[in-house]
């Protein structure tokens, strides 16, 4: 049995006096039995290195201890962890290496009674060969020098290894969790997020995304929220073919803090760079982190020019508050593991701590938008835009594009912002996903949407949103095999399933007439947060599409109820607005008016107000519809969808109500470049697509322009991937029949009427438009 040496150690809030056998925390003695204490000394002596079970047995237990060794070791480890306040499942100090041994995670400061005698690894050559070997190893060991100051003794540290091998602009990097030996939980997760913000300012460096890290952890058999220790991060690095792992550390030395950063090649373990900085106070830690991040960027190959251009200090780029940054970083982690909705309270907390935290507002707005709460999204993105000067360049791109998407609605400006963003940060997936998901579809540029969606997936194969936006563009183009293949790529080996995936499966099944597939998708959504109400609304639309309005109303109410139970009032209002619209299209005017007004009392978001105004106009309430149209024009003067889709369609219906079909046709001219687009109202509530086309067709009918009317309704039938289950897709058959009847072509008219009546063969018999259709068809016989 070999007794550990007599040096003293300091780590975090703890001190160890080997000679007296004392463990102190902030000067107070902690009781620890002899065996756990000697175990601690061995681990400290080998900090950063795996100490095998065999070595522990040889050094602490009797050589002939075999039977009781395992249980004795477990007891000693447990008692030691209890003394340090450590946990096996989420270790700060002692990491269990299955079937091998243990490792002390925190770099330990080894001290002696003489300030002239320096730390382990810098002693005279007479030191044991084992120490020299440890010095040459790749372990994360800090050498601490004793330095005398007038005001007292302060400790500074440096890394043992030196070397510089540059990264290329094609390399990716994995960021490990910081080792926090201070005992202060405010640094847990916070410094990693802060470093990520600093490094993501670089157009040169590219960090592996959190989505890809989580996916890789699953393939490793680890939980998605597993701690990224140096060893785990190295395996993630190897599995993702990344170039390097960045390991960080923060330690307290008296009242000061020491930060370190080291980059290793994950394949060879070669050290690329090592940086260190000291912070005199807790409040200076973020500034110190900014310093080492900037140094690291230049030393691994980034040009000084780009570092100087894109290098906003962390306190200015995010927040000077560690507590706010802690809430923000935790929110991002929660969003990854449990969804955007679960992260909302933490993001709100971050903005409460720092009311000028621009990116916290931006993420809060994005999270609200993802759950269909556009009003709250707009409010928070507006605040982010107000404080955008307190953000890095990359974050400002995000905030500016989000502002144009969610506040002004000016998609031309959003497109320009995303294009410059993608040029400046060519490996950032977000501008491509914005273009593919929210800009090109509204313009009707679905092929461009596919192109940008593919880029998104290529840049990050584990980014679920990338597959989602690509799938939507394939559906718009009715490339259903490509859409299904994209979903399969996401859900197969990568296991990337989000609520959108179920909705997309339902839409594909609907377009194929696959009732069993629709039922499977709907069943998978039952009880799923964020999916059940959405799919219930899809089911309501499908029922309305075939004329089963009574069943559709029941399903629509269920969708709204589920949304309200989840505190999503705006989503509930959207579903109610959609129901009012299909009632209005079918001529059930009193009910449509009631439901529309009720929806507007719940929420007055842009899309709800448009849908309500449209339903009221169809139902003959021109006065109230005009009031809402004026309000839309006042509130959204720059909004692309409002200016070139919503208002032209509304004004055209109002003109028809006044018996002015020619004026209606003229008013709709401005909508022509955008009319085949998927408007924002169709993203969550599935209404509004091709409404300008439908209204123009009605105007052509009213103007007795039969051929032109038929051409408009044929556009709707030719673009089922855009309309999907909106009831105008079924009603277009009827309107086409009316156009052919007006032209005198009874044969084509009969065919069109038959197509409509086949879709509505089991429809509710008392629907006004259904009764009209049957009478009109009878006259053609």
Q: Which stretches of residues belong to each language-model region?
A:
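Structural signal of TPR/SEL1 helical repeats
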Residues: 331, 365, 401, 436-437, ...
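Acidic, proline/glycine-rich low-complexity intrinsically disordered segments
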Residues: 7, 17, 22-24, 28-31, ...
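DNA-binding patch around the recognition helix
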Residues: 2-10, 31, 43-48, 64-126
């Amino acid at each position: 049995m070999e007794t550990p040496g007599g040096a003293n150690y300091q780590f975090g809030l703890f001190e160890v006096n080997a000679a007296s056998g004392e463990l102190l925390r902030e000067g107070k003695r902690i009781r620890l039995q002899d065996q756990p204490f000697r175990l601690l000394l061995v681990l400290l002596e080998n900090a950063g290195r795996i100490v095998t079970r065999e070595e522990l047995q040889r050094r602490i237990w009797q050589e002939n201890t075999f039977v009781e060794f395992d249980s004795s070791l477990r007891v000693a480890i447990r008692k030691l962890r209890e003394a340090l306040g450590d946990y096996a499942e989420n270790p700060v100090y002692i990491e269990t290496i299955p079937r091998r041994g243990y490792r002390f995670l925190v770099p330990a400061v080894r001290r002696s009674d003489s300030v002239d005698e320096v730390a382990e690894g810098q002693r005279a050559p007479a030191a044991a060969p084992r120490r020299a070997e440890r010095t040459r190893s790749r372990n994360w060991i800090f050498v601490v020098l004793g330095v005398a100051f007038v005001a007292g003794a302060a400790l500074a540290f440096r890394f043992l290894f030196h070397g510089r091998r540059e990264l290329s602009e094609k390399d990716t990097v994995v960021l490990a969790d910081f080792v926090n030996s201070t005992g202060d939980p405010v640094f847990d997760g916070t410094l990693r997020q802060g470093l990520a913000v600093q490094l993501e300012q670089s157009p040169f460096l590219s960090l592996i995304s959190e989505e890809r890290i989580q996916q890789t952890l699953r393939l490793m058999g680890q939980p998605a929220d597993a701690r990224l220790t140096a060893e785990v991060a190295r395996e993630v690095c190897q599995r993702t073919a990344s170039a390097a792992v960045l390991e960080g550390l923060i330690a307290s030395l008296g009242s000061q803090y020491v930060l370190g950063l080291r980059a290793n090649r994950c394949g060879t373990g070669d050290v690329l760079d090592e940086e260190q900085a000291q912070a005199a106070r807790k409040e200076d830690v973020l500034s110190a982190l900014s310093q080492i991040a900037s140094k690291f960027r230049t030393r691994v190959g980034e040009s000084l020019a780009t570092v100087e251009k894109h290098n906003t200090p962390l306190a200015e780029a995010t927040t000077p508050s560690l507590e706010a940054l802690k809430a923000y970083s935790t929110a991002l982690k929660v969003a990854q593991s449990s969804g955007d909705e679960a992260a909302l309270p933490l993001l709100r907390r971050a903005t409460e701590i720092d009311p000028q935290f621009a990116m916290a507002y931006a993420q809060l707005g994005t999270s609200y938008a993802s759950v269909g709460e556009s009003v709250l999204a707009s409010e928070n993105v507006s605040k982010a835009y107000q404080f955008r000067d307190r953000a890095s360049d990359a974050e400002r791109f995000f905030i500016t594009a989000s502002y144009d998407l969610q506040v002004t609605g000016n998609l031309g400006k959003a497109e320009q912002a995303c294009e410059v963003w993608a040029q400046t940060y060519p490996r950032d997936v977000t501008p491509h996903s914005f273009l593919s998901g929210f800009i090109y579809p509204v313009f009707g540029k679905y092929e461009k949407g596919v192109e940008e969606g593919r880029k998104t997936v290529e840049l990050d194969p584990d980014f679920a949103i990338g597959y989602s936006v690509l799938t939507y563009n394939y559906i718009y183009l009715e490339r259903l095999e490509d859409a299904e293949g994209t979903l399969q790529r996401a859900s197969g080996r990568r296991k990337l399933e989000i609520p959108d995936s179920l909705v997309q499966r339902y839409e594909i099944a609907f377009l194929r007439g696959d009732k069993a597939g629709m039922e499977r998708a709907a069943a998978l959504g039952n009880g799923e947060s964020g999916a059940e109400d959405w799919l219930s609304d899809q089911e309501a639309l499908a029922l309305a599409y075939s004329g089963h309005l009574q069943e559709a109303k029941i399903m629509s109410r269920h969708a709204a109820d589920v949304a309200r139970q989840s505190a999503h009032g705006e989503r509930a209002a959207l579903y109610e607005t959609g129901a009012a619209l299909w009632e209005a299209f079918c001529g059930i005017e009193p009910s449509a008016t009631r439901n529309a007004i009720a929806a507007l009392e719940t929420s007055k978001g842009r899309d709800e107000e448009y849908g309500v105004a449209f339903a009221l106009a169809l139902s003959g309430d021109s006065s109230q519809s005009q009031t809402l149209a004026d309000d839309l024009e006042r509130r959204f003067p720059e909004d692309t969808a409002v200016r070139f889709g919503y208002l032209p369609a509304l004004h055209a219906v109002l003109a028809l109500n006044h018996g002015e079909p020619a004026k209606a046709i003229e008013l709709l001219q401005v909508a022509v470049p955008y009319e085949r687009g998927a408007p924002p109202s169709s993203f969550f509530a599935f209404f509004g697509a091709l409404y300008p086309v439908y209204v123009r067709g009605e105007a052509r009918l009213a103007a007795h322009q039969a051929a032109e009317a038929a051409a408009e309704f044929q556009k709707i039938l030719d673009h089922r991937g855009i309309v999907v289950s909106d009831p105008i897709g079924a009603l277009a058959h009827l309107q086409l029949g009316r156009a052919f009847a007006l032209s005198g072509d009874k044969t084509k008219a009969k065919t069109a009427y038959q197509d409509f009546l086949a879709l509505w063969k089991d429809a509710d018999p008392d629907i006004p438009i259904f009764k009209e259709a049957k009478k009109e068809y009878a006259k053609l016989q």
